[in-house]
Amino acid sequence: YVKHPAAMRWTHIALPATNIDKTIDWYTRFTPLELLDRREDTDGQGAWLGHPDQGDKPFVLVLVSFTKDQDKGQQPIMAPFAHIGIEVTSKEEVDEIARRGDAEGCLAWPPTLMPPPIGYICALKDPDGNMIEFSYDQGVYAKAQEVWG
């Protein structure tokens, strides 16, 4: 590769996916992530999902479906508390995500107002049972802007 980061960077989280097509579809419907790359070889399939506006500082979700693990079924890594967090723009957006998740049978935590700094949250389970938290007013974005500009 010709391009490399100027300094050490946090670049990805990797999760196993039992059915990579179903999992890519789930993440592109329920989160702001978009498919960046997809590969397949004899060892299995892989996909990178991320935010298209992060070209200069990418952070991606890596989904991997190893051929040798296909008969093992779901392998949730992020459960019951470990989770990926996504900050949304409004309380109503949390409610809408929870409504959609409930309709599809993947709502894990209903919308709940938690004490600071947690904020208003809900969580869904992805097709492999991993927890994805959606929060409003959690403050991660605000704190990063305050401290790092």
Regions found by a protein language model. Give the residues of each.
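Core segments of cupin and vicinal oxygen chelate
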Residues: 7, 15-61, 65
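Alpha-helical elements of the RecA-like P-loop NTPase motor core of helicases
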Residues: 24-25, 95, 132-133
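Acetyl-CoA-dependent GNAT
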Residues: 64-70, 137-138
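Vicinal oxygen chelate
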Residues: 1-6, 9-19, 47-52, 72-149
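A generic structural micro-feature
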Residues: 5, 41, 55, 76-78, ...
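Short beta-strand/turn micro-motifs at beta-sheet edges
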Residues: 1-2, 68-74
